[in-house]
Amino acid sequence: MAEQAVSEPSVYAVEEYSVQEEPYYLPIADEIELFETAYEQRIPVLLKGPTGAGKTRFVEYMAYRLGRPMMKVSSQTGEEAEHRMPLITVACHEDLTASDLVGRYLLDTDGTKWVDGPLTRAVKVGAICYLDEVVEARKDTTVLI
């Protein structure tokens, strides 16, 4: 069986990843301005704190706040679609592999097909990718990040 790479469509259904309602978040200091500046400069952000400190809620709030409409164009059909800022959350654990994040080849009836992982999907659509509890991931997976 010959191996062939079949790429995913260039437009993903990202509506399921959009934060539709404004989450309640009470700023403590200048974290909103710092996050916005990092986002504008394309600098990754690491949030560190104990369980229940509000890291996940803050990322959800920022995804909503940065939720200006984004245009995506499908190279296959030329159709345009408008979406809010997607937020893709990955719950990290000790069994999480690099392939789980990036993607992998899978067999189907037509041969081999590449399926993007959440990190690759986030990069392709300009989403925020939140790796929850990244310290729980395997060392070989964190090297990828």
Predicted features, each with a name:
Residues 1-145:
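AAA+ P-loop NTPase catalytic core and its hallmark functional loops
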